Design a protein with these regions (language model features):
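Rieske [2Fe-2S] iron-sulfur-binding subdomain
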Residues: 1-84, 105, 118-193
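N-terminal pre-triad scaffold of radical SAM enzymes
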Residues: 72, 87-91, 98-99
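Short cysteine-rich clusters marking metal-coordination/redox-active sites
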Residues: 92, 111
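Short beta-strand
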Residues: 102
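Basic side chains
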Residues: 79, 93-95
């Protein structure tokens, strides 16, 4: 079977990439631009593993937030009223409108479309005009959240509710990185796109 006949995911295609450095070959070019490859990475890596989202110093106070898109998911990373760091969906549960942009500070999250308002923990607290809807319970419509944990000043998120805790996932990295005092580092420059 020729290389061109093999699936992009066929392990045989990548044997040479794991050879000793003096014998190794690079990854095939299509892994860098294939939508099929990207989709597989999203499902097998980015939706299952811990991902760095921001730094704790970017959201030092209650109400501070950073709005991000991670694997096509609109998220807001924020510090709630109790100082807990949370990762919430940035799409309103009513009509899917974008709730926030950029970064800043807020006391609540309010949708610009119909003014649904959420507490900083994601709880739906105000729904103008919904009082007329039968059987509507605000408690049934919080903002979806993803796991958020911190280490070394970094805020990590994970879309997989069953993933191992962050520190367990980091394994020996925590000890190896200890001399670098990551928690003392500060963001001094951001890449604006």
């Amino acid at each position: 079977v020729s290389v061109t006949d093999q699936s992009i995911f066929s392990p045989e295609r990548y044997v040479g990439t794991r050879a000793p450095i003096e014998e190794a070959v690079p990854l095939p070019p299509e892994v860098y631009f294939s939508e099929e490859w990207y989709d597989r990475e999203v499902e097998t890596i980015f939706r299952r593993e811990w991902l760095v989202a921001t730094r704790e110093e970017e959201i030092p106070n209650p109400g501070d937030y950073v709005r991000l898109d991670i694997v096509d998911e609109p998220l807001v990373i924020l510090r709630d009223d109790d100082g807990v760091i949370r990762a919430l969906s940035a799409s309103c549960r009513h009509r899917g409108s974008e709730l926030m942009t950029g970064s800043g500070n807020c006391r609540r999250i309010t949708c610009p479309y119909h003014a649904w308002s959420y507490a900083l923990d994601g709880e739906l607290i105000a729904t103008p005009a919904m009082h007329e809807a039968d059987d509507f319970d605000k408690a049934d419509h919080p903002l979806p959240s993803v796991r958020a944990e911190t280490w070394g000043g970094f805020v990590f998120i994970n879309f997989d509710p069953d993933a191992k805790p962050l520190l367990e996932s980091l394994g020996g990295l925590v000890e190896r990185m200890a001399p670098y005092r990551m928690e003392e580092m500060k963001v001094t420059r951001k890449w604006e796109n």
